[in-house]
Structure formats: C-alpha cells, structure tokens
Amino acid sequence: MRAYPCRRFLMSLASSTLKAYERWAPVYPPTAHNPLMRAEQRSMLEVWPNVEGGRVLDLACGSGRYSHVLCKSNAAQVVALDFCLPMLTQVAGASRVCGSMMQLPFQSGVFDAVISGLAVGHATDIRQWMSEVARVLRPAGILLYSDFHSEAIRAGMTRSFKDEDDVTRTVPHQVYDLSCQQDAMAAAGLTIETVRELRMGIELNEAFPGSEGVYRKWYGVPVVLIVRARKE
C-alpha cells in the first residue's frame, strides 16, 4: 500500500519550490555548470532522440540549457516551459511558455519528443506528470528525462545552492523510486527503452575542490537517474 501526500502539503511543496528557483535564477547559468550536471548532460546526449524537423518540448526548462541543445539539433520548433518566470526569461532561441508541468497548456499529440532535465522530483504527482507527458506526445514520441536518484536522497544528499547573498538554500524534492516511475509510465502508455544510473566516483568522477572526500564518502551511490521511453 502506498501513502500519498495530502493536497495541502503538495501545494505547499510547489510554492516552496517556486520560491527557491526564484532565488536561484539570478545565479543560475543556462549551462551544465557543475560536475553532476556535466555528467548528467553527457549521458543524456548519448541517448538523445533524433529531433531533426520535429516539434520538441523542453519541460521544466529552467534557464534553458537543453533548449539550447535542441535548437542546435535542427528541431523545427522548440517549446520551453517552466513555472519560474525569472528562469524562463533567460531561455534563448525557443518559444517560451510559463506554466505548470502538472497541467500542460498544449493540445494532445503535438510533440515528437519531450526532454526534461533534473525536474521530475518537483512533480507533485508522478502519475499525473507521466500522464500529461504521454498526452502531449505523438504516437511513437520519445520522452527523455533525468532526475536526482532516490538512493542519493535517502543516503542524505540534498539539492542546494547559494543565492545572490551567498546564503545556502535547499530546494524541496519529492522522492520517486524507479519502480514508482515505472508504474506511472506503464499506466500512461509509455514503454521504457533505456535506464541509466550515474554513480558517485564512477560515472560521476570529475575532480573539484574536496572531491576526493566526497567520492570516498558516497562511492557507488547512484546520484542521477536517466530514462528514455516511447509512447505506445
């Protein structure tokens, strides 16, 4: 039996997440700007769908690092959606939409691919998120997403940043096990093609100040999950 968070808690979570990103936006560049993001982006690009001539959604686009990649991939149209306007205003080259990833403001079956980087844990309901993604995908359309691994969060890792005032802030993040995500995809009519797990000190091994101690402490812990799925 699964316990589901109450609606009031989920609304509070979404509000807290939005406030965190509004604080983060002024210091959040539209690039993979840390070792984790660089490892994640390399792995995402290795399973990148062919979007040439297609219509693609960059879901929860942030400041637009994947929108930039998509625009260089010769997609016919790139649509970037995010709920944080200060983040969205940094996106270049894409059609920008400010909205919720839980209720996508698009007609059904209009995208050839949906890309989402490190954002699934901000979904207040994973089944609804997968259902909305599947709805806007065309038949045989591709979903490619990454997120922070549930094992990393359970091991004690947090998602945090330093704002303009050099104050460390934590970003709220839901924990969705892979099995939970698999169930949600199956219910939405999405078939998994690829699953990747990036582990501390193995796939994620770029040196940075203090990295030796970090990798020793967390060695082998999965820190990023990457999934590619196809709409049936």
Language model region names:
Residues F9-V51, R65-V69, M87, I142-P172, R199, ...:
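Conserved class I S-adenosyl-L-methionine
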Residues H173-V195:
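Short alpha-helix
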Residues M102-V114:
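A short acidic, Gly/Pro-enriched loop at the edge of an enzyme's catalytic core
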Residues A113-I126:
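A short SAM/SAH-binding and catalytic strip from SAM-dependent methyltransferases
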Residues L57-L59, S63-Q103:
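Class I SAM-dependent methyltransferase SAM/SAH-binding core
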Residues I192-E232:
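Conserved Class I S-adenosyl-L-methionine
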Residues R127-I142:
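A short glycine-rich, Lys/Arg-flanked "PGG" loop and its adjoining helix->strand segment in the class I
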